[in-house]
């Protein structure tokens, strides 16, 4: 594995290997000294063209816990805001000796361009590109599911037979796209639920069932319910009548939460719009994995950086 750009092209064995290495990294986080010397002497650049809190901090923590040198680059206040191209930025990073570049970009396909261009000889990790993909978010979601379902015996396990329902703004969600492909690769059955206006045209070609009625989807007794944020910043039109109407029809409120099995899992990639797509009670319930997902993110990103920069030496 030279780059981590997409879950659509990620092989099953590579996905399970990464999740297993993430288990080892999670064990490290349980120690008093949460650090390994694995990437000492390596330089990891976080190249963020979009605002981010969770993902950026998570990648910073992951690289530092592997003893890498970390450079964080924000487009705001940089030469990019003055018109510098992605090519020129990449060549600048190459001159600085970057070994890995974690890139978040508003344009779909930007990380793939960076990886294939020859502008920089570094491992590329996609930290979210437009509405295309967000592979490490899907991996940390799968890691969290696997731990909840299989506990300490999760190493080497897939998600065969697990029913996952993803609800909300599918149209603008790179998280949904990455999850659909990865979960299918790991054997899960995925159902997407959204108003028709928030489903992309190409969704009919995805390996997932499509529904428009959340109550009907919950009646099918899914193992996992993943709620997605309404991405108002990407909307330039009315995709539903009102937020109240959206919440009434597609929000995970207290009454719908009460219908779920006691051992079901409620997920949200964050940030949450409490009271819109998910109630406070659902977000804070014992079924919720929201905080676990944040912790899992560091472990999964440690595993990704380790495998890209040192873990494949044995392969």
Swiss-Prot record:
Assigned EC number: 2.1.3.2
Top enzyme class: transferase
Catalytic function, reaction form: carbamoyl phosphate + L-aspartate = N-carbamoyl-L-aspartate + phosphate + H(+)
GO CC annotation, single: cytosol
Record's keyword terms, sorted: Pyrimidine biosynthesis, Transferase
Pathways per UniProt: Pyrimidine metabolism; UMP biosynthesis via de novo pathway; (S)-dihydroorotate from bicarbonate: step 2/3
Binding site for carbamoyl phosphate: 54-55, 104, 134, 137, 270-271
Recorded GO MF terms: amino acid binding; aspartate carbamoyltransferase activity
PROSITE patterns: CARBAMOYLTRANSFERASE
Residue runs in coiled coils: none
PANTHER family linked: ASPARTATE CARBAMOYLTRANSFERASE (PTHR45753:SF6), ORNITHINE CARBAMOYLTRANSFERASE, MITOCHONDRIAL (PTHR45753)
Role summary: Catalyzes the condensation of carbamoyl phosphate and aspartate to form carbamoyl aspartate and inorganic phosphate, the committed step in the de novo pyrimidine nucleotide biosynthesis pathway.
Quaternary data: Heterododecamer (2C3:3R2) of six catalytic PyrB chains organized as two trimers (C3), and six regulatory PyrI chains organized as three dimers (R2).
Protein name (database record): Aspartate carbamoyltransferase catalytic subunit
Lineage, opening ranks: Bacteria, Bacillati, Actinomycetota, Actinomycetes, Micrococcales
């Amino acid at each position: 594995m030279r780059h981590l750009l997409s879950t659509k092209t990620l092989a099953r064995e590579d996905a399970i290997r990464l999740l297993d290495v993430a288990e080892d990294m999670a064990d490290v986080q349980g120690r008093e000294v949460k650090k390994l010397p694995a990437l000492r002497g390596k330089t990891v650049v976080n190249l963020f063209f979009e605002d981010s809190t969770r993902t950026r901090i998570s990648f910073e923590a992951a690289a530092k816990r592997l003893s890498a040198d970390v450079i964080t680059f924000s487009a705001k206040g940089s030469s990019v805001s003055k018109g510098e191209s992605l090519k020129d930025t990449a060549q600048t990073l190459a001159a600085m000796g970057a070994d890995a570049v974690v890139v978040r970009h508003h344009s779909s396909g930007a990380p793939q361009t960076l990886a294939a261009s020859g502008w920089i000889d570094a491992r590329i990790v996609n930290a979210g590109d437009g509405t295309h993909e967000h592979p490490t978010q899907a991996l940390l979601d799968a890691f969290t599911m696997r731990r909840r379902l299989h506990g300490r015996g999760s190493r080497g396990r897939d998600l065969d037979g697990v029913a996952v329902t993803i609800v909300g703004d599918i149209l603008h969600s790179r998280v949904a796209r990455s999850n659909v492909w990865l979960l299918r690769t790991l054997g899960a059955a995925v159902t997407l639920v959204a108003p028709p206006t928030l489903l992309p045209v190409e969704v009919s070609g995805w390996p997932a069932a499509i529904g428009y009625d959340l109550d009907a989807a919950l009646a099918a007794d899914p193992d996992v319910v993943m709620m997605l944020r309404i991405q108002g910043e990407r909307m330039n039109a009315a995709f539903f009548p009102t937020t109240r109407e959206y919440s009434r029809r597609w929000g995970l409120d207290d009454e719908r939460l009460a219908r779920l099995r006691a051992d079901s899992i409620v997920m949200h990639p964050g940030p949450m719009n409490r009271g819109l797509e998910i109630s406070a009670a659902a977000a804070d319930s014992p079924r919720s994995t929201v905080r676990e997902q944040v912790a899992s993110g560091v472990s999964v990103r440690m595993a990704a950086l380790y495998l890209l920069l040192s873990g494949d030496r044995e392969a």
